[in-house]
């Protein structure tokens, strides 16, 4: 069995370099919620050095709230902003002799695109316009995955090690209790259940079906590195290969 392990990087946390030795894919902030040209360049350099797949992590224009504020923007605006961010990271990657592999939206752009078909379409269209060979990463079973498939893109369905799930397979909003799983054992158990058995227990106790093609590790958690190491060793024990 094989699984991709991804992390959101270039967001101002000190653990980036070490996380890049543990993950197989990196989603690099493109300046709209965090990061700038120099952090993008540094992250790309480290990712290439570690053989990690490079991806763009576009966001709503919302540095003040770290891209976590809901926005209602016209689809054409989202298309242009997404294309702008993807293009910037693609150029920085190419200049260093690397190849950009995927795109994963950030924060509320990701969450809204999981449920809003027009927004999902705008993002998928931007990815396709930039490079039809790019992989589009989205929440398992979401509108974003459906939109990517409609454009003929390769999609990668994502699950979260440290997030609570609702009965419909969507994430518990960060503003609500149960959104974040702080207990390491619980997060490990949830991850293995999703990867090995394709299901996750919701905060209300029901099982939801999920397709786990990539697991997200949040680099901003207090114990991010320790958990990443634990997850890697657990995967190794279970014969699960980590690869993009």
From Swiss-Prot:
Keyword Metal-binding: no
Reactions catalysed according to its record: 5-oxo-L-proline + ATP + 2 H2O = L-glutamate + ADP + phosphate + H(+)
Biological processes, Gene Ontology terms: carbohydrate metabolic process
Entry's transmembrane regions: none
Cell membrane among keywords: no
Primary enzyme class: hydrolase
UniProtKB keywords: ATP-binding, Hydrolase, Nucleotide-binding
Pfam families: LamB_YcsF
Stored PANTHER family: 5-OXOPROLINASE SUBUNIT A (PTHR30292:SF0), UNCHARACTERIZED PROTEIN YBGL-RELATED (PTHR30292)
Subunit structure: Forms a complex composed of PxpA, PxpB and PxpC.
Purpose: Catalyzes the cleavage of 5-oxoproline to form L-glutamate coupled to the hydrolysis of ATP to ADP and inorganic phosphate.
Name by which UniProt lists this protein: 5-oxoprolinase subunit A
Upper classification of the organism: Bacteria, Pseudomonadati, Pseudomonadota, Gammaproteobacteria, Enterobacterales
